[in-house]
A protein has these predicted regions:
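Negatively charged
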Residues: 20-435
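A generic structural signal for short, non-catalytic loop/turn and secondary-structure boundary residues
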Residues: 7-9, 18-19, 392, 419, ...
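Generic detector of low-complexity/intrinsically disordered segments
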Residues: 8-10, 15-16, 282, 290, ...
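Generic structural signal for short, solvent-exposed loop/turn connectors between secondary structure elements
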Residues: 1-5, 15, 20, 55-56, ...
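Sterically constrained small-residue positions within well-ordered secondary structures
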Residues: 10, 41-43, 52, 95, ...
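Bacterial Sec-dependent N-terminal signal peptides
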Residues: 1-23, 240, 438, 452, ...
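C-terminal outer-membrane/trafficking sorting elements
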Residues: 442-517
Length: 517
């Protein structure tokens, strides 16, 4: 008796363990969709069939009718590079064929099941296009269990699965996954689950379009509810977060403790996220290169970002366009690598900050960054003055139409300098009634040395009380020193290389690195 009990217990535990190993999904093959979804397959599945978009070698598929588990089937040694047809046959649920659901369980079997990929697609520009369904995506209702499948990729795993829900309480094995692009792209019913906070994302590099709910036509979809707690994810390997939450109407989770130190691309990340307003000031953005359209059409975001390291950023166009609540100082941003700020604050109807401290030395496209922003006369004047007085400001910039900005009478000469000397094109602004004080103008001028690199002279800007200088080479040796009687220092006698210039004023010492060439 005891022996029989132990034997039964052993087989029960074995069955339970095997059941936990399966990737389980729920399907409704008889459901109708308008318009009819076409699968890129040899033929279209009927009301008792599905195309299962699985990829693997010699894996096993088991299925059963929900509510009638005796109606089941098994497919062994399945090998597929795109999809496999599952034929459920006639339902046991009399008269209910259209609503009959099936539980599909996939295990490694005699080989390996590797990937579930719903669509093939191309990226045209930065947007997914030419999507072709590889499975009966409109018939997939639920992810019930992840099992122990060692996934190799989550690229487009559930893209365009517009009915899919996540009810699994376990976590997928993402150890070997580096790409989660489009994982739930256009999965409009996907609301996530609390279990997502336990996912190990430490090796994933690409998160672009992961939860994006926006058609290639840039139309955003209403009615979705995704707002899962994913603030604990390990993002240390991440490089691309572009479009990650674009168009998600309810997403508002705290992501401030994400490690984004390797991320280069955040373009469109929170675009058209109408409730997202969480702090991001802890982020290490030292690798960041692209923030174009990052907060585009986000009407509530208004969090401090002034401590971001933007020294590597190249693209800032439309970053806060139509971000109608945003009004935070960005005067400490290093924009010296930025090539485009076009429409950056266009229609940002609360933005009223001076940008006069910005170093625009790499700027190529500056078209209309303040068009219909809320910048007032003082801050717009300080911006023009700061840029006019900065020797790094480039020539030949089309600043475009910045209606309805106004400038002070005493910065007309600064604006004229940009137009007549720097060959800028500026339109849409008009002279206002404010007066910019001398202190305000000076506060928008950086302490600078220029040119750098240099071959003969270093010129000093805005160091009025400088008394003495020292030049030290990179071995620590003092190579030149003297009294500062002019606004320049002759360095022609120095050999080519890297140096540190120390300027001594009444109150402090200022250190600058420069290159003699």
């Amino acid at each position: 008796m005891i022996s029989r009990f132990l034997t039964l217990a052993f087989f029960f535990l074995l069955y339970f363990a095997e059941a936990q190993n399966e990737f389980i999904t729920i399907w409704q093959p008889g459901i109708t969709t308008n318009p009819v979804q076409t699968v890129d397959a040899p033929f279209q599945a009927n009301a008792n069939q599905i195309w299962f978009p699985g990829i693997g070698q010699n894996y096993t598929i088991e299925w059963e009718e929900v509510g009638y588990p005796s109606n089941n089937g098994t497919m062994i040694n399945v090998t597929s590079t795109s999809q496999v047809l599952i034929d459920f046959g006639p339902t046991r649920e009399e008269g209910q064929g259209a609503t009959t659901k099936y539980r599909v369980k996939v295990s490694n079997g005699n080989g390996t099941f590797q990937q579930f990929k719903s669509v093939s697609y191309q990226i045209i520009g930065t947007v997914p296009a030419n999507m072709q369904s590889k499975g009966s995506l409109d018939k997939l209702l639920e992810i019930e269990q992840w099992g122990n499948i060692n996934w190799t990729s989550m690229d487009a795993a559930f893209a365009n699965c517009q009915r899919v829900l996540l009810t699994a309480t376990d976590s997928p094995d993402l150890t070997n996954v580096t790409d989660a692009s489009l994982m739930f792209y256009l999965a409009t019913s996907f609301s996530g689950a609390p279990s997502m906070q336990n996912w190990d994302t430490s090796n994933i590099e690409i998160f672009k379009h992961m939860f994006d709910c926006r058609h290639a036509s840039q139309v955003y979809i209403s009615g979705e509810t995704f707002n899962s707690p994913i603030g604990t994810w390990n993002m240390s390997a991440a490089t691309d977060l572009s479009y990650m939450f674009a168009g998600r109407q309810h997403f508002n989770q705290n992501l401030n403790f994400w490690n984004v130190s390797n991320v280069t691309n955040m373009a469109w990340m929170f675009a058209a996220c109408p409730v997202f307003n969480q702090p991001l000031n802890n982020w290490n953005t030292s690798s960041l290169e692209n923030i174009e359209f990052m907060f585009f059409l986000n009407h509530v975001f208004n969090q401090p970002l002034n401590n971001w390291d933007t020294s590597q950023v190249i693209k800032m166009n439309n970053a806060f366009s139509f971000a109608t609540s945003f009004n935070q100082p960005l005067d400490s941003w290093d924009v010296s690598s930025v090539t485009t700020i076009s429409a950056m604050f266009s229609n940002a109807s609360s933005f009223n900050q001076s940008l006069g401290s910005w170093d625009l030395s790499s700027l190529v496209n500056g078209l209309g960054p303040l068009h219909f922003s809320a910048i007032n006369c003082q801050n717009y004047s300080a911006t023009l003055a700061g840029w006019a007085d900065n020797p790094n400001t480039p020539d030949n910039i089309d600043f475009g139409n910045n209606t309805p900005a106004q400038y002070a009478a005493n910065v007309v000469n600064k604006r004229d300098f940009l137009i007549n000397t720097k060959n800028w094109t500026i339109s849409g602004d008009t002279q206002g009634s404010c007066i910019l004080s001398t202190v305000e103008i000076k506060n928008n001028q950086k302490i600078l040395i220029y040119p750098n690199p240099t071959s003969d002279f270093i010129y000093l800007n805005q160091i009025s009380d400088a008394k003495k200088y020292q030049i030290i080479d990179f071995s620590g040796r003092l190579v030149k020193h003297g009294e500062l009687k002019e606004k320049w220092i002759d360095v022609k006698s120095l050999t080519n290389g890297n140096y540190i210039l120390i300027i001594k004023t009444k109150e402090k010492e200022l250190n600058f690195k420069f290159i003699k060439d």
